[in-house]
Amino acid sequence: MELTNVYPWEDLIKLKIQESAENYLETILILSRRNPYVRSIDIANELAFSKPSVSVAMKNLRENGYILMDDQGHITLSSMGKEIAETMYERHTMLSQWLMYLGVD
């Protein structure tokens, strides 16, 4: 069976966008634990992405209610965004610990 028969292309694109959004949200969570505030440039530096790419992503996250941005460009997670970010962070932490337990680097 071909992949296109299982998932329409539009659904694959949506899945990729969701994964990307989750990664951005998790990165914002991690940065907010290290720094008093998070800016787009901090996210770009952390992920080694271009500033324009991050700006587009932040616009989408803001429009979908996952983040808040003040007049100075400081980014905070909304309650919905924080819930997703914490879930992703916990999953990644648990997976990393499990792989380390198994002896995988």
Language-model-derived ranges and their functions:
Residues 8-49:
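N-terminal helix-turn-helix DNA-binding core of bacterial DNA-binding proteins
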Residues 17, 77, 104-105:
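Alpha-helical hairpin
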Residues 27, 57-60, 66, 80, ...:
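Residue-level recognition of specific faces of alpha-helices
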Residues 39, 87-91, 98:
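N-terminal intrinsically disordered, low-complexity, charge/repeat-rich segments that act as generic
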Residues 40-71:
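Canonical helix-turn-helix DNA-binding module
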Residues 73-91:
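Basic, amphipathic "hinge/linker" alpha-helix immediately C-terminal to the N-terminal HTH DNA-binding motif
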Residues 93-105:
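Amphipathic alpha-helical dimerization/coiled-coil segments
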